[in-house]
C-alpha cells in the first residue's frame, strides 16, 4: 500500500479527460496548455495543504491570488477587462480539475467567475465593467453575489432586502443575505433587492433590481455569522447585513425592477460550473477508489478483481463520462449563443447526483477506511454534497426539465 501522502488525489496521473470523447470536439493545443499548467499548480501548490485547510477552515487567499495571476480568476472575462476570455468548455474543464484536488478552492473559483463577474458582464454598463472587472479578473478583489436570504432559498423572488430610491437618484439599501460565498472576504458585491412592488399582472419576480458596489466605498455594511459547514470548509460562507447603506445611482446594475431575467441567466451560467465541480469531486473519488481497490487485497486477490467491485467501477466511470458529455453540450450551446437553460439543467442535475453517488460508492469500497479522515474520500463526499443544493437544487432542476418535457408533449 502507498503512504498517506501518496494516497491523495493525483491530477498528474489522472486519465486525460481532454479530447478523448469521440462525440466531443477535442481541445486544442492552447486549451491543453492551460490545463497542463493548472494541473502542475494544483499538484505542487494546492494538493499538499488541502486536507489541512479542510480541518482549519483557513481561506487560501495566497492561492487565490496566484490563480488570479494565471488568469483563472477571470477565466471568461474579456481580455479588454483584464480577463483570459476563455470559452465555456475550457472553463468547465478548469473547474473539474480544481475540484479533483480541492473542492473548497473550486467553489471559490467557480462562484467568483460565474456569479459576481457573470452578472456584471450580463447587466453592467461599460462604465461598470471598466470599474469592477479588472480587479475581479486579477483577484485583487474577490466577488460575492447576494441572492439567498433567511426566508427565501429556492423561492428566490421572495426576498425581503429592499432599496429605496432617494430624490437625488441614489439608493438606501437595507436587509440581509445568507449563505453568501466569499461573504466575509469579498471586495465587490452584487446584491439583489426589491425596489418596487410587482406591477399588475406580473409575478413577484417583477420589481427586483441588482446593485454592484465595492465594500470599501460604503458604510453600513457588516458581516454577520460565518457558517460552520459540513464540507467546503475553507471556502468562505457568511451572512451579509445592510443597514442604511447609501449607494449612488450608478450602482444600479441592469434595468430597474427587471433584474430577475438577468438572475436566471447568471444561474444558468453558474450551473455549468457547479455541474463541473460535482463531476470533478466524483472523479476524484472514483480515481481514488480504483487505485485503492487495485492495491487492497482481500480473499487472496486485489479487491478490484472481484466482479462486484469491477462492475461498480465500470458503472461509476460510465456515469461520470456521461455527465461530462452533458456539461460539454451545455457549454458549447452557451458559447454558440443558443438557448441552454434546459441542457444545463440536465447537466447540473445529472453531474451532481452521479458525482455524489461516486463519492458514496468510494466510501463503501474503502469500507471502514473510507469513513476516517486519514483517507480523502470522506472529504470528497462532504464537499460534493453542496453541489446538489447550490445554484438550484435537484428539485429545481427537475422542475425546469419536467416543464420542458410536458410542454413538448402537450404541443
What does each model-identified segment do?
Residues 161-164:
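A structural signal for short hydrophobic beta-strand segments in well-ordered beta-sheet cores
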Amino acid at each position: 500500500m502507498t503512504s498517506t501522502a501518496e494516497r491523495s488525489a493525483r491530477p498528474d496521473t489522472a486519465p486525460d479527460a481532454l479530447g478523448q470523447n469521440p462525440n466531443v470536439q477535442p481541445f486544442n493545443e492552447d486549451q491543453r496548455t492551460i490545463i497542463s499548467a493548472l494541473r502542475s499548480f494544483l499538484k505542487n501548490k494546492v494538493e499538499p495543504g488541502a486536507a489541512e485547510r479542510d480541518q482549519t477552515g483557513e481561506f487560501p487567499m495566497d492561492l487565490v491570488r496566484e490563480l488570479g495571476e494565471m488568469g483563472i480568476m477571470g477565466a471568461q472575462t474579456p481580455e479588454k477587462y483584464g480577463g483570459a476570455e476563455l470559452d465555456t468548455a475550457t472553463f468547465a474543464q478548469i473547474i473539474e480539475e480544481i475540484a479533483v484536488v480541492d473542492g473548497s478552492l473550486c467553489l471559490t473559483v467557480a462562484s467568483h467567475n460565474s456569479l459576481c463577474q457573470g452578472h456584471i458582464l450580463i447587466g453592467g454598463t461599460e462604465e461598470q465593467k471598466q470599474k469592477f472587472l479588472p480587479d475581479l479578473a486579477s483577484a485583487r478583489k474577490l466577488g460575492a453575489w447576494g441572492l439567498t436570504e433567511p426566508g427565501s432559498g429556492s423561492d428566490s423572488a421572495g426576498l425581503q432586502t429592499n432599496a429605496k430610491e432617494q430624490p437625488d437618484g441614489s439608493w438606501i439599501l437595507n436587509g440581509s443575505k445568507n449563505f453568501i460565498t466569499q461573504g466575509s472576504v469579498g471586495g465587490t458585491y452584487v446584491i439583489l433587492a426589491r425596489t418596487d412592488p410587482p406591477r399588475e399582472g406580473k409575478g413577484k419576480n417583477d420589481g427586483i433590481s441588482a446593485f454592484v458596489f465595492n465594500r470599501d466605498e460604503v458604510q453600513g455594511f457588516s458581516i454577520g455569522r460565518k457558517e460552520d459547514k459540513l464540507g467546503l470548509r475553507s471556502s468562505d460562507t457568511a451572512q451579509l447585513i445592510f443597514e442604511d447603506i447609501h449607494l449612488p445611482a450608478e450602482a444600479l446594475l441592469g434595468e430597474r425592477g427587471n433584474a430577475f431575467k438577468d438572475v436566471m441567466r447568471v444561474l444558468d451560467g453558474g450551473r455549468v460550473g457547479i455541474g463541473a465541480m460535482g463531476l470533478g469531486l466524483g472523479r476524484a473519488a472514483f480515481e481514488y477508489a480504483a487505485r485503492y481497490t487495485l492495491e487492497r487485497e482481500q480473499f487472496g486477490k486485489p479487491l478490484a478483481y472481484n466482479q462486484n467491485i469491477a462492475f461498480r467501477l465500470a458503472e461509476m466511470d460510465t456515469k461520470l463520462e456521461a455527465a461530462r458529455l452533458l456539461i460539454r453540450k451545455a457549454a458549447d450551446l452557451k458559447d454558440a449563443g443558443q438557448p441552454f437553460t434546459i441542457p444545463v439543467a440536465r447537466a447540473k442535475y445529472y453531474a451532481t447526483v452521479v458525482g455524489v453517488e461516486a463519492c458514496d460508492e468510494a466510501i463503501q469500497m474503502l469500507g471502514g477506511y473510507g469513513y476516517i479522515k486519514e483517507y480523502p474520500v470522506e472529504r470528497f463526499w462532504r464537499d460534493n454534497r453542496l453541489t446538489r443544493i447550490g445554484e438550484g437544487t435537484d428539485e429545481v432542476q427537475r422542475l425546469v426539465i419536467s416543464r420542458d418535457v410536458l410542454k413538448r408533449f402537450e404541443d
